From Swiss-Prot:
This is DNA ligase. The gene is ligA. GO terms for molecular function: DNA ligase (NAD+) activity; metal ion binding. Gene3D superfamilies: 5' to 3' exonuclease, C-terminal subdomain, 6.20.10.30, BRCT domain, DNA ligase/mRNA capping enzyme, Helix hairpin bin, Nucleic acid-binding proteins. GO terms for cellular component: cytosol. It is an enzyme of class 6 (ligase). DNA ligase that catalyzes the formation of phosphodiester linkages between 5'-phosphoryl and 3'-hydroxyl groups in double-stranded DNA using NAD as a coenzyme and as the energy source for the reaction. It is essential for DNA replication and repair of damaged DNA. Belongs to the NAD-dependent DNA ligase family. LigA subfamily.
């Protein structure tokens, strides 16, 4: 058993190593819950024995130093992190410390504000005469990285304050984050391009903000909530609640899930509610931030070296669970990437039963030293994706054997290859049935051709029975053949044939995305097809003038090289010709969203918010969303007072009822199509 001095040294080393990996390398090595527990242990050791406190202790600073590659800037006002409370006793102890700091009797009432703690990355935004002048990361709390060019790409951050008489100088603090649905789309695109997946939204956000190319940041669609306001003293609002109102009036998004609290009981009720309800939110939250409402009293309370005395983060309990690893299976993606997946005894996490989690790649398996039969600790990263966070080797049975990935593709028997610096292992056999199935699933997916009724099970039947050997073969199927397959009746077969016919009308951007070219996602496909009106002009540029492609906003060299390689492959040229023989043009047409957008010199739906509900006669939900956004409109997932139009199809449901109650205008598909075509 180490003595206190040895334990303090051990904790400092562990925490400093983890902080360096998180803040400087952007490669977290320790989950938050473990870091928080170890930090709390070190803090208590130093408080009980002050001689153990050293200058390099993580309790004496906020985080890691700025990384190389960006300019280091000094914060005008320190951007400190918050102390944590892990239970009600911790919260009560903080409240007593706060009362002593402002010289109030214990038990005195205090007005407090409770706000959700967004699981993202803190930013400091400086405005000069209402115009965004500088944006910086937290860094070590005193100095951060200047990332203004990246932050300008975040739509939720105004470049100019929406104020008639903006102050000469103001600084706003807030949290950049990636919403859950956006995170899922980013990982889906990365998977489609054969790239490693992000572990959770916060890590994805941190890595995005530190990209040297702002085009990459723009493509990942970060969001932002503002929560702190710093004005010259004479202009500062009287309270935190008023400051939040000021921020809303200035054009910032402020989290609506907040409350004025008269005592700790109010705070605990707020925290208890959101601990359960957080799973319904479109973003990750890991606790509640409690702040003293009166800003004059905040100044009186002041700061410790590390954090403000007038605020604390009340953390939700970390959702982790132990389980036993049963087996590791491999999945083969449409690009041939082999993804190992852990299968374990079911555990309950974040309101759902979980029994599988991706292991990402062979390096991750080696890092975990994973053995079959191991007791593993599982959590939902960002409350979304199950992941294996660690192994408990002390519980390893004597019969446990190391996990070994196969050397040959389990589908076709070809050698598996790991090229260059890639972490991914691939099957490089283009005729591999698993790659074909993945390519077909991608082609018919909602973001691509959106073929209703053609799911994974049916695709497996078609490939396994040799009925489909390429994408083009889908369009040679007939209703009689489909009707003879398992679980396919005459009606289902006829519906699928109609859906395949309808897919020929999808936009040029969707067709390009559906081809599954390495590195091309939905966003980049739209950008490319806005510049090149057909596949022939795109192929010519890809093979002879790649600089025309890299000149497109958001398109880099890797993507241009992927296009060149794809179009140079005779098999892919044959596929295009085969699909053209089945009615595909691979070009803009009069109803294409790209042409609709080009026809309107101004985005004539800009500033309007739409909500889609029910089934439309001809447009899929994703296609209607795409066309509205091309014309400048915004599509929201829920009805509110800010909604301008509800587009309602069959079986519209509760959204239609709510919209009618709020007096929101209702559109059918015909009226929507008319709005899309009408330009000012």
């Amino acid at each position: 058993m180490p003595d206190q001095s040895e334990r303090a040294t051990e904790l400092r080393n562990l925490l400093n190593t983890a902080a360096h990996a998180y803040y400087v390398l952007d490669t977290p090595t320790m989950e938050d819950a473990v870091y928080d527990r170890l930090y709390q242990e070190l803090l208590e050791l130093e408080q009980n024995t002050p001689s153990l406190k050293t200058a390099d202790s993580p309790t004496q600073r906020v985080g890691g130093a700025p990384a190389e590659g960006f300019t280091s800037v000094e914060h005008r006002i320190g951007l400190l992190s918050l102390d944590n409370a892990f239970n009600r006793d911790d919260l009560s102890a903080w409240n007593e410390r706060l009362l002593r700091a402002i010289d109030r009797p214990l038990g005195s009432p205090l007005d407090l504000v409770s706000e959700l703690k967004i699981d993202g990355n803190a930013l400091a935004l400086s405005y000069r005469n209402g115009v965004l002048e500088r944006a910086a990361t937290r860094g070590d709390g005193q100095r951060g990285e200047e990332i203004t060019a990246n932050v300008r790409t975040i739509s939720a951050i105004p470049l100019r304050l929406r104020l008639d008489n903006p102050p000469e100088w103001v600084e706003i603090r807030g949290e950049a984050f990636i919403p859950d649905n956006t995170f899922a789309e980013i990982n889906a695109e990365r998977e489609s391009r054969g790239e490693a997946l992000f572990a959770n939204p916060r890590n994805a956000c941190a890595g995005t903000l530190r990209q040297l190319d702002p085009k990459v940041v723009a493509a990942r669609r970060l969001d932002f909530f503002a929560y702190t306001l710093h004005l010259p003293t004479q202009e500062q609002p009287a309270s935190q609640w008023d400051a939040l109102t000021w921020l809303e009036n200035a054009g910032f998004r402020v989290n609506p899930n907040r409350a004025l609290c008269a005592d700790l009981a109010d705070i605990n009720r707020f925290s208890d509610h959101w601990e359960q309800a957080r799973h319904d939110l479109p973003y990750a939250t890991d606790g509640v931030v409690v702040k003293l409402n009166n800003l004059v009293l905040q100044d009186e309370a002041g700061f410790t070296q590390k954090s403000p005395r007038w605020a604390i983060a009340l953390k939700f309990p970390a959702e982790e669970a132990p389980s036993r690893l049963l087996r590791v299976v491999v999945q083969i993606g449409r690009t041939g990437v082999i993804t190992p997946v852990a299968e374990f005894e079911p555990v309950a996490l974040a309101g759902t039963s979980v029994s599988r989690a991706t292991l990402h790649n062979a390096d991750r398996i080696a890092e975990l030293d994973l053995h079959l039969g191991d007791t593993i600790v599982v959590r939902k990263a960002g409350e979304i994706i199950p992941e294996v966070v660690r192994v408990l080797p002390e519980l390893r049975p004597s019969s446990a054997t190391p996990v070994q990935l196969p050397e040959h593709c389990p589908e076709c028997g070809s050698n598996l290859v790991r090229e260059g610096d890639e972490v991914a292992t691939r099957c490089v056999n283009s005729s591999c049935p698993a790659i074909l199935r993945g390519g077909l699933r991608h082609w018919v997916s909602k973001g691509a051709l959106d073929v209703d009724g053609l799911g994974s099970k049916l695709i497996e039947q078609l490939v396994d029975q040799g009925l489909v050997r390429s994408i083009a073969d889908l369009y040679r199927l007939d209703a009689a053949l489909l009707g003879s397959l398992d679980r396919m009746g005459e009606r289902s077969a006829n519906n699928l044939i109609e859906a395949l016919k309808l897919s020929r009308q999808r936009s040029w951007a969707r067709q390009l995305y559906g081809l599954g070219i390495h590195h091309i996602g939905e966003v980049s496909a739209k950008a490319i097809t806005a510049e090149f009106s057909d596949s022939n002009s795109l192929m010519e540029a890809a093979c002879t003038a790649p600089e025309r492609i890299t000149a497109i906003y958001g398109i880099g060299t890797e993507l241009a090289q992927s296009l060149q390689q794809w179009f140079s492959n005779p098999a892919n040229q044959h596929l295009l010709d085969d699909l053209r023989s089945q009615g595909f043009r691979f070009a803009l047409d009069d109803n294409d969203p790209g042409r609709l957008g080009a026809a309107a010199s101004e985005q004539h739906l800009k500033g309007l918010t739409f909500v889609l509900t029910g089934t439309l006669p001809t447009l899929s939900r994703s296609e209607a969303k795409e066309r509205i956004e091309t014309c400048g409109g915004k599509v929201s997932g829920s009805v509110s007072k800010k909604t301008d139009y509800l587009v309602a199809g069959e079986e519209a449901g509760s959204k239609l009822t709510k919209a009618t109650t709020l007096g929101i205008k209702i559109l059918d598909e015909d009226r929507l199509q008319a709005m899309l075509k009408d330009s000012p």
